[in-house]
From Swiss-Prot:
InterPro entries: A-crystallin/Hsp20_dom, ACD_HspB1, Alpha-crystallin/sHSP_animal, HSP20-like_chaperone. Keywords: Chaperone, Cytoplasm, Cytoskeleton, Nucleus, Phosphoprotein, Stress response. It comes from the Eukaryota. GO terms for biological process: chaperone-mediated protein folding; negative regulation of apoptotic process; protein refolding; response to heat. The keyword Cytoplasm applies. The lineage of its organism: Eukaryota, Metazoa, Chordata, Craniata, Vertebrata. CDD domains: ACD_HspB1_like. This is Heat shock protein beta-1. It comes from Poeciliopsis lucida (Desert topminnow).
Length: 201
């Protein structure tokens, strides 16, 4: 099957889909190229995170051994809640499928339409993004990613569309081909014609 690229359409206003009871799946923790938030981990002793942080990035207060008794349960829960909130609010993709439509929504806030490529090949949807090194509040950063999704066998590849919202959410949709109707068996009676009238056999 030949490779096919999907053009973008930009959404000028955000749209919200009505929730349904069909299949839905989400993929978390896809924050492409985001730096770690040290406040999420500063409340934990360094012995709990062996080799996680680079020595050059550790601040003196993090390097000081601390006793687990110093950590109040409420304080620990607050740090965990912030870490979970950050994880769930960035880089999330969602797949939804109904009887008529298949849709993937991917959070790509750091990429412009020119830096994104959406294409299909051999029943696989591939979304990739890349931008060269640029400066942000943490220094210089370059980002790239590639995500592949297996399309349903009944998806209409020729009618796949994609759109990018102002909030940086990329949505790709593919209509689902309806199966051929199955007709029940019907026996047709045979009429026998006679010279005077038509008799039913």
């Amino acid at each position: 099957m030949a490779e096919r690229r999907i053009p973008f359409t930009l959404q000028r206003t955000p749209s919200w889909d009505v929730p349904d009871l069909h299949q839905t799946s989400r993929i978390f923790d896809q924050a492409f190229g985001l730096p770690p938030v040290f406040e999420d981990f500063s409340g934990f002793p360094t012995t709990h995170w062996p080799g996680y942080m680079r020595p050059s990035l550790m601040t003196p207060d993090i390097m000081i051994p601390q006793s687990p008794m110093m950590y109040h349960p409420g304080h620990m829960m607050a740090h965990q809640a912030r870490a979970l909130s950050r994880q769930m609010s960035s880089g999330m993709s969602e797949i939804k499928q109904t009887q008529d439509n298949w849709k993937i929504s991917l959070d790509v806030p750091h990429f412009s339409p020119e830096e994104l490529v959406v294409k299909t090949k051999d029943g696989v949807l591939e979304i990739s993004g890349k931008h060269e090194e640029r400066k942000d509040e943490h220094g210089f950063v370059s980002r790239s990613f590639t995500r592949k999704y297996t399309l349903p066998p009944t998806a209409n590849i020729e009618k796949v569309t994609s759109s990018l919202s102002p909030e940086g959410v990329l949505t790709v949709e593919a209509p689902i081909n309806k199966p051929a109707l199955e007709y029940s068996e019907t026996t047709i009676p045979v009429n026998v014609e006679s010279s005077g009238a038509v008799a039913k056999k």
